[in-house]
């Protein structure tokens, strides 16, 4: 399967996983990577700098109407839903929270699957609610690739376990296996 977009979603406990995954990504990844993390509304934007310090790829916090470029990691800003448009740009949205979250992983997974049918991969990491499960179902319906962190390696197993319970996932990976799996998608 050719991947043109990878979206990673997570909540409680997922930042540590990303800090392990990012340094091990290939520098020649040809698709954009979008990261949706549940963050407090007033959280500082230092997270992009922190992730950038660990990544071989550039990391940018998403801005409204920003073009989506290959080989770049994009981070959702706090308190905005991130929509991926069919014209290869982002839209930021402040509509109601979904699964008590803004940004919502489901919102981004679903819009990414619409924009990149047959060429989307979704990765769901550690977290404390069911956000991401419906979006992964939709990715699967659009013939995308569905990857979930092994709940036993998650700080908070609820989110990945919900996905496993509801969806036929393509891969269940220990956190140490995620980067090499992504690298094989290149």
Give the ranges of each region predicted by the language model.
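Conserved acid/base catalytic micro-environments in cytosolic active-site loops
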Residues: 1-186
